[in-house]
Amino acid sequence: MLFSYLLATLPLLANAALTYKGADISSVFIEEKAGVAYKNLAGETQALEAILTDNGVNSIRQRVWVKNGDYDLTYNVNLAKRVAATGASIYLDLHYSDDWADPKHQTTPDGWSTDDINTLADQIYQYTLSVCNTFAEEKINVEIVSIGNEITSGLLWPLGKTPNYENIARLLHSGAWGVKDSKLATKPKILIHLDNGWDWDQQKYFYDTALGTGLLTSDDFDMIGVSYYPFYNEKATLASLKTSLTNIQTTYGKEVAVVETNWPVKCSSPEFAFPADLKDIPFSVDGQVTFLQRLAETLTATKASGFFYWEPAWTKNAGLGSSCEDNLLVDYNTNQVRNSVKAFGQV
């Protein structure tokens, strides 16, 4: 009887192990403005965030840019209100830029200092504080705040560009305290995000060097987030990811999550070879399910917090910046979600 009971509860235990089964839907307002009306599995028109949460998504990631316009603070407050109505938690991804921030682009916002680190450190603090206080005033709870996006090469260039880790550490410290000093009643988890989550050497070098300056302390942040895209490097195996996530937690004592990932339904001419332990997964809707299941198994095995699927419904950008033609969980011809969306509720 006891053995049978344990077998019956194993799926429940696996589900409970993943705190976050999330998606980044930052582009949703732009899509809706372009006339896209999303359809659920039954073919009925429904808000994207509701479709996702109905299928097991429990957290939504939103990118925040500094300049007024798409992805600005007002854009994100309005999106967060819709997300909050579904019961999903909110994860703000502060790019600290007027445009895309990633390992190749970390452009300082217009009007922010590019020649004085004291001024820039105050600007990142004041901006972060203002963003968080705005959400507090709107009575919107925030679960996670990322102080930068894929900052492997630093943030707020040129002052915060590698190899100037003293400036990087100081800026991260200032950003973190913008969150800590805010009026948010429940303080969000503060997250630092690098790319190539499978590359332990890269992760270790960044954190050892930044923390080694003494200007960023372990108390400044709560989580480490990583991107995991299998189609950018043959070395990006699940085995390597497992090793890296395990080492991150053991070395730094931080909660860890895969905060960006996706899998293609079509990839005719991949720029890079796919990792060996993923080559058997087809480029298809079923393949998306298999990939997310294996990823979830890896995360559960390492006691990681969860994952966020990056832009599953950006129908005007189906390749999502990769060499694959289509990485979406939505059919861009019909705007209907694919059956793979059910994977969130199955992992």
From Swiss-Prot:
Annotated function: Endogalactanase involved in the degradation of plant cell wall polysaccharides, and more particularly of hairy regions of pectin.
The UniProt record lists the keyword Glycoprotein: no
Residues at the catalytic site: E150, E260
GO CC field: extracellular region
Alphabetical list of Pfam families matching this protein: Glyco_hydro_53
Protein encoded by which gene: galA
EC number(s) reported in the record: 3.2.1.89
Signal peptide: 1-16
Domain of life: Eukaryota
Keywords: Carbohydrate metabolism, Cell wall biogenesis/degradation, Glycosidase, Hydrolase, Polysaccharide degradation, Secreted, Signal
Compartments reported by the entry: Secreted
One example of a Gene Ontology biological process annotation: pectin catabolic process
Enzymatic reactions: The enzyme specifically hydrolyzes (1->4)-beta-D-galactosidic linkages in type I arabinogalactans
Annotated family: Belongs to the glycosyl hydrolase 53 family.
SUPFAM superfamilies, alphabetized: (Trans)glycosidases
Molecular function per GO: arabinogalactan endo-1,4-beta-galactosidase activity; glucosidase activity
Entry annotated with the keyword Nucleotidyltransferase: no
Protein name: Probable arabinogalactan endo-beta-1,4-galactanase A
